[in-house]
């Protein structure tokens, strides 16, 4: 550990002690490193005696800085791991970081692009439009056509800081996993590793550019979602250049109402966008919190969502989509047996899971929820309760489902904030049923035939030759097999004869030795020994002949 890392570790431990995090663990369960730290750093007192545990943890993350704040924000979405009071407090974390100076941003952009800003852009504003822990955004115009753009640039020298903090977080996670018996359910090492992958992905803006291009292509011409254009020729790992958009923040209800927005349709559009991404495209924006969603000023009677910051996306394969759709339909029909069977069939829980017990556990958790009217039921919380129940039956963490459940909670929360009477089930059901209709039945068969038709059209002329070649190889392999079988039988026969001769030789040897000890039978003993030698010689020759 370097002196700088040791200093940072001391700072982390100091903050945890000052926020009273160690006191949240009962004394009898406290690991010895925690007790040692508290006794060794006796001058660091708990400054948060009167606060609940959620507030203490939130304040600790805020004091630890932007990397830990982002980690806390990620944890707030993992309601399958954290108690509700802690998750709700962590959801209040805000990524408030002072901007770095415009001159540093200019140098970073020019170093990445290999030319001066004035070569490519006009009206570059050194005062950032927005600032966050990893990057900040500046406005400008493209010199070639005057289009308004935003330039997102990674903070200078942020990568070594992130990597150092991640190493310390991994070390702390290993300590917690080793010394805190109750940490097994929280899986601290897995959670930190998941965060490490997420934040390192965010450092590569080319990845975000690719995600935005894919999402924009999926919704070309859509009345539901608009994704700003990315100017790839000016994008690098540390610089992202895209179209500047103007819109109303989706969380600004007053401004939306003042603009005459159709709030019911806007809320339903959010659900439409989510389920279209999941079931049509298998590619969804997985960071749809209010800060990343705007609403177009134009056509408020037919509102258009605008999505930005595509750094985090999720994907689902065909099987995951099928199981997910069937799960939704099954538990809204209260078919808990089918829900349990689907979890086993999908491989989400071990194949030896007792379906009867699993069904009963699901029924116990979900039946009280479905006593409410469907319009009051939270899709996200149904999934959350379902995953928590499945985890008791050793369900493995499914990263794509965790992202999906987090995004669904965002969409649902936004939708009900915009229009409290939103019936998510009625809005989503047509998408689920249509997708299932596309996947099973005559139409699905016809679609599969159409999808494979070009392949078979290409291969059909080759079919006679392939059949002939297959028959020829089969005939050749049959002859080869017959020869191998004949050789095997011959070898087995020789081996049997050799074993017989060796056995007779051994018997004659024993008889000869015995007769030699009897003076009246010396001649017979000599004959037996000679016979034994002859049998062994023949047996040895037979084993050598193959």
UniProtKB/Swiss-Prot annotation:
<dbReference type="InterPro" id="IPR010232">
    <property type="entry name" value="UbiB"/>
</dbReference>
<keyword id="KW-0067">ATP-binding</keyword>
<dbReference type="GO" id="GO:0004672">
    <property type="term" value="F:protein kinase activity"/>
</dbReference>
<comment type="pathway">
    <text>Cofactor biosynthesis; ubiquinone biosynthesis [regulation].</text>
</comment>
<keyword id="KW-0831">Ubiquinone biosynthesis</keyword>
<keyword id="KW-0997">Cell inner membrane</keyword>
<keyword id="KW-1003">Cell membrane</keyword>
<keyword id="KW-0808">Transferase</keyword>
<dbReference type="InterPro" id="IPR050154">
    <property type="entry name" value="UbiB_kinase"/>
</dbReference>
<dbReference type="InterPro" id="IPR045308">
    <property type="entry name" value="UbiB_bact"/>
</dbReference>
<dbReference type="GO" id="GO:0005886">
    <property type="term" value="C:plasma membrane"/>
</dbReference>
<keyword id="KW-0547">Nucleotide-binding</keyword>
<feature type="domain" description="Protein kinase">
    <location>
        <begin position="123"/>
        <end position="501"/>
    </location>
</feature>
<feature type="transmembrane region" description="Helical">
    <location>
        <begin position="522"/>
        <end position="541"/>
    </location>
</feature>
<dbReference type="InterPro" id="IPR004147">
    <property type="entry name" value="ABC1_dom"/>
</dbReference>
<feature type="binding site">
    <location>
        <begin position="129"/>
        <end position="137"/>
    </location>
    <ligand>
        <name>ATP</name>
    </ligand>
</feature>
<protein>
    <recommendedName>
        <fullName>Probable protein kinase UbiB</fullName>
        <ecNumber>2.7.-.-</ecNumber>
    </recommendedName>
</protein>
<feature type="active site" description="Proton acceptor">
    <location>
        <position position="287"/>
    </location>
</feature>
<dbReference type="InterPro" id="IPR011009">
    <property type="entry name" value="Kinase-like_dom_sf"/>
</dbReference>
<keyword id="KW-0418">Kinase</keyword>
<keyword id="KW-1133">Transmembrane helix</keyword>
<comment type="function">
    <text>Is probably a protein kinase regulator of UbiI activity which is involved in aerobic coenzyme Q (ubiquinone) biosynthesis.</text>
</comment>
<feature type="binding site">
    <location>
        <position position="152"/>
    </location>
    <ligand>
        <name>ATP</name>
    </ligand>
</feature>
<dbReference type="GO" id="GO:0006744">
    <property type="term" value="P:ubiquinone biosynthetic process"/>
</dbReference>
<keyword id="KW-0472">Membrane</keyword>
<dbReference type="GO" id="GO:0010795">
    <property type="term" value="P:regulation of ubiquinone biosynthetic process"/>
</dbReference>
<dbReference type="GO" id="GO:0005524">
    <property type="term" value="F:ATP binding"/>
</dbReference>
<comment type="similarity">
    <text>Belongs to the ABC1 family. UbiB subfamily.</text>
</comment>
<dbReference type="Pfam" id="PF03109">
    <property type="entry name" value="ABC1"/>
</dbReference>
<feature type="transmembrane region" description="Helical">
    <location>
        <begin position="498"/>
        <end position="517"/>
    </location>
</feature>
<keyword id="KW-0812">Transmembrane</keyword>
């Amino acid at each position: 550990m370097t002196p700088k890392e040791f200093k940072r570790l001391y700072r982390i431990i100091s903050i945890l002690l000052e926020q009273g995090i160690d006191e949240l663990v009962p004394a009898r369960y406290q690991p010895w490193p925690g007790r040692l730290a508290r006794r060794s750093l006796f001058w660091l007192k708990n400054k948060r005696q009167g606060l609940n545990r959620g507030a203490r943890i939130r304040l600790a993350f805020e004091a630890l800085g932007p990397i830990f704040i982002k980690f806390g924000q990620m944890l707030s979405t993992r309601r399958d791991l954290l108690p509700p009071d802690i998750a709700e407090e962590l959801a209040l974390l805000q990524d408030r970081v002072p901007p770095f100076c415009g001159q540093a941003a200019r140098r970073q952009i020019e170093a990445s692009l290999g030319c001066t800003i004035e070569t490519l852009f006009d009206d570059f504003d050194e005062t950032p439009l927005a600032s966050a822990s990893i990057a900040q955004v500046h406005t400008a115009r493209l010199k070639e056509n005057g289009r308004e753009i935003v330039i997102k640039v990674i903070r200078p020298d942020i990568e070594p800081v992130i990597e150092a903090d991640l190493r310390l977080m991994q070390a702390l996670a290993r300590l917690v996993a080793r010394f805190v018996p109750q940490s097994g359910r929280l899986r601290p090492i897995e959670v930190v590793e998941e965060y490490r992958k997420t934040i390192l992905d965010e450092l590569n803006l080319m990845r975000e550019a690719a995600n935005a291009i894919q999402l924009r292509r999926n919704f070309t011409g859509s009345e539901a979602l608009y994704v700003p254009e990315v100017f790839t020729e000016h994008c690098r790992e540390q610089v992202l250049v895209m179209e500047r958009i103007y819109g109303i923040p989706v969380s600004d209800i007053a401004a939306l109402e003042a603009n005459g927005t159709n709030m019911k349709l806007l809320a339903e559009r959010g659900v439409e966008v989510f389920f279209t991404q999941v079931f049509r495209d298998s590619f969804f924006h997985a960071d749809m919190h209010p800060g990343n969603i705007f609403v177009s000023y134009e056509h408020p009677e037919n509102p258009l969502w605008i999505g930005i910051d595509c750094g985090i996306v999720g994907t689902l394969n065909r099987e995951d989509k099928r199981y997910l759709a069937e799960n939704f339909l099954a538990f809204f029909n209260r078919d808990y047996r089918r829900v349990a069977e689907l979890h086993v069939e999908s491989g989400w829980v071990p194949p030896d899971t007792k379906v009867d017990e699993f069904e009963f556990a699901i029924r116990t958790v979900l039946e009280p929820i479905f006593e409410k009217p469907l319009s009051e039921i939270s899709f996200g919380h149904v999934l959350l309760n379902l995953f928590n129940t499945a985890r008791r039956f050793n369900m493995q963490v499914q990263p794509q489902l965790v992202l999906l459940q987090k995004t669904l909670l965002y969409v649902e929360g936004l939708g009900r904030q915009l229009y409290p009477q939103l019936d998510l089930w009625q809005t989503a059901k047509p998408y689920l049923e249509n997708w299932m209709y596309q996947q099973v039945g005559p139409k699905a068969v016809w679609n599969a035939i159409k999808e494979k038709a070009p392949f078979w059209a290409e291969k059909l002329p080759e079919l006679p030759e392939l059949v002939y070649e297959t028959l020829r190889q089969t005939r050749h392999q049959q002859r080869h097999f017959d020869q191998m079988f004949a050789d095997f039988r011959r070898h087995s026969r020789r081996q049997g004869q050799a074993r017989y001769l060796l056995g007779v030789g051994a018997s004659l040897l024993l008889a000869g030795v015995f007769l030699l000890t009897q003076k009246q039978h010396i001649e017979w003993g000599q004959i037996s020994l000679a016979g034994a030698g002859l049998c062994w010689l023949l047996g040895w020759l037979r084993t050598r002949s193959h």
